[in-house]
UniProtKB/Swiss-Prot annotation:
Gene name of the encoded protein: ddl
Occurrences of domain ATP-grasp (ranges): 134-339
Reaction(s) catalysed by this chain's protein: 2 D-alanine + ATP = D-alanyl-D-alanine + ADP + phosphate + H(+)
Role description: Cell wall formation.
Keyword check for Magnesium: yes
Residues where Mg(2+) 1 binds: 293, 306
Protein's recorded name: D-alanine--D-alanine ligase
Main localization, broad class: cytoplasm
Lineage: Bacteria, Bacillati, Bacillota, Bacilli, Bacillales
Keywords in alphabetical order: ATP-binding, Cell shape, Cell wall biogenesis/degradation, Cytoplasm, Ligase, Magnesium, Manganese, Metal-binding, Nucleotide-binding, Peptidoglycan synthesis
Positions that bind Mg(2+) 2: 306, 308
NCBIfam families: D_ala_D_alaTIGR, PRK01966.1-2, PRK01966.1-4
EC number assigned by the record: 6.3.2.4
InterPro entries: ATP-grasp, ATP_grasp_subdomain_1, D-Ala_lig_Van_CS, D_ala_D_ala, Dala_Dala_lig_C, Dala_Dala_lig_N, PreATP-grasp_dom_sf
Length: 356
């Protein structure tokens, strides 16, 4: 069998750089190397691109992915062809956060006409920006919790008015979030005004725009979506926390969360969640993969929280685990995503770019 040429891209100029490397290690150790010839590109914290070709061995130490002994190359040359001299059948970006999950690198792949795994420019950018995403959900009629949003420059000029707006529109606890980050980076749970001001200061270290959301006593439930024009969903899974707030540290360092798959919910609630996940997928014109996150209250009210266009993708993350529960292994999920990338690229070829 002739191997397909795949390039995995990871790292990136983002606060989620280390998460991306962990994801790359997991994917590289699970991808079917009998089917694929795999090259890797590492984007350093400084934005340099480094390439290593024909990865065949298990990645035992994550530090080996830093490519400290390799010189940086020119981006378009690195992406032009694989180690066997042929064009790539697909690029697999494993990038989280700004400069990777926000439509920027997807735009590069589009300009270079490269097939790539995951969401396109519009879906990636709108899913990354929490305010835009919420506005699209609102247009689609999906129920959400109350929120407000403002810019750093607005807060610097009108701090008192904004603090009053939070008091008038929301009740404590509230969650302060950078508008354009994932993995719970820069997010704070605030129970009073002092914590609110500290949380705003923390969030503005990571973004010029933030969102403050109403807190709620509810279960956190997630649904995985996979596909292009005709996506499929999983049964929901639940995040079980040993901490008050599911932050970056508890997600990736402390091991203080576990996953309940499938979630213990009435079947009617589960089906509603799956249907809402499909609506959210369509609302932002997604393709490839999405994880839709919800709140479910004790009386089974459902509120959509967000969609994640590049969800956590380590072997123990919720998204692959949900598909594992549906009978799709981690390795086969990787293969399916590559096939979806090629399918979307073939569909793009049907478009005309000239006028007769």
């Amino acid at each position: 069998m002739v191997k397909e040429n795949i390039c995995i891209v990871y790292g990136g100029k983002s606060a989620e750089h280390d998460v991306s490397k962990l994801t790359a290690q997991n994917v590289l150790n699970a991808i079917d190397k009998e089917r694929y010839l795999v090259d890797i590109i590492y984007i350093t914290n400084d934005g340099l691109w480094k390439k290593k070709e024909n990865i065949t061995e298990e990645i035992k130490e994550i530090e080996s992915l830093n490519m400290t002994d390799i010189e940086a190359g020119e981006i378009t040359i690195l992406l032009k062809e694989s180690s066997n001299g042929k064009p790539y059948d697909a690029i697999f970006p494993l990038l989280h956060g700004p400069n990777g999950e926000d439509g920027t690198i997807q735009g590069l792949f589009e300009v270079l006409d490269l097939p790539y795994v995951g969401n396109g420019v519009l879906a990636a950018s709108s899913s990354m920006d929490k305010l835009v995403m919420k506005q699209l959900f609102e247009h689609r009629g999906l129920p959400q919790l109350p929120y407000i949003s403002f810019l750093r420059s607005e807060y610097e000029k009108y701090e008192g008015n904004i603090i009053k707006l939070v008091k008038d529109k929301l009740t404590y606890p509230v969650f302060v979030k950078p508008a354009n980050l994932g993995s719970s980076v820069g997010i704070s749970k605030c129970n009073n005004e002092d914590e609110l001001k500290s949380g705003i200061e923390e969030a503005f270290q990571f973004d010029r725009k933030l969102v403050i959301e109403q807190g709620i006593n509810a279960r956190e439930v997630e649904v995985a979506v996979l596909g292009n024009d005709y996506p499929e969903t999983t049964w929901p899974g639940e995040v079980i926390k040993d901490v008050a707030f599911y932050d970056y540290k508890s997600k990736y360092k402390d091991g203080k969360i576990s996953l309940q798959i499938p979630a213990e919910l009435d079947e009617e609630v589960q089906m509603t969640l799956r249907n809402m996940a499909l609506e959210a997928f369509k609302a932002t014109d997604c393709s490839g993969l999405v994880r839709a996150d919800f709140f479910v209250t004790e009386d089974n009210q459902i509120f959509i929280n967000e969609t994640n266009a590049m969800p956590g993708f380590t072997a123990f993350s919720m998204y692959p685990s949900l598909w594992e529960n549906m009978g799709l292994s981690y390795s086969d999920l990787i293969t399916k995503l590559i096939d979806l990338a090629k399918e979307r690229h073939e569909d793009k070829k049907k478009n005309k770019y000239t006028i007769d």
